[in-house]
Amino acid sequence: MLSAQLEAYLAEINLPATAEQKKQLLDFVGMLNKWNKAYNLTSVRDPEIMLVRHIMDSLVVSKHLQGDRFIDVGTGPGLPGIPLAIMNPDKTFVLLDSLGKRIRFQKQVAFELGIHNVSSIESRVEAYQPEQKFDGVLSRAFASIHDMLTWCHHLPAEHGQFYALKGQLSDDEMQHIPTGFAITETIELKVPRLDEQRHLLKIIKE
């Protein structure tokens, strides 16, 4: 059942996937559902809803990524980083979260599913000082745009950008962007079977 749904959703967003990638995505849902019972990683309890709200909600960003090296801040159980890493094996993803149980889950997922282009780091974002900066800084359900930019300003490389995954856009939030940053693009995203607004904001340091 889940397999057929995934197939249909990927076709709907026009995202080609190999048999191995589809298996990894479904296995990720299975592990998230299993671990969630003990670790409370997400409020979503139904695997079919996980597929929409977590997997597809992450993957609609995939074709908009520019660059090779990304960091997912406040990643939680690895969203959107793990689904994006599965679908973009040529790119590398660092998953950053301050909670150890989430990091342990991410590492187990990467090990069991054979995902070799992710690494997980337990740290608060403002305390994390990478040796190499990033082409893209991803945030989903992490913080307000203002706080995200304030805390993550040191993470992008010279020509890197921020990718803020948001629901409904708030005029107040959009108007309170810190000095020195600019929104370059606002993209309306359509997530299969999700009747809610989704947007991707691309932001650069000026």
Swiss-Prot record:
Pfam families cross-referenced by the UniProt entry: GidB
Transmembrane helix listed as a keyword: no
Class in the EC hierarchy, top level: transferase
Annotated residues for binding of S-adenosyl-L-methionine: G74, L79, V125, E126, R140
Localization in the cell: Cytoplasm
InterPro entries from the UniProt entry: rRNA_ssu_MeTfrase_G, SAM-dependent_MTases_sf
Entry's Gene Ontology molecular function annotations: rRNA (guanine-N7-)-methyltransferase activity
Family classification: Belongs to the methyltransferase superfamily. RNA methyltransferase RsmG family.
Protein name: Ribosomal RNA small subunit methyltransferase G
Name of the coding gene: rsmG
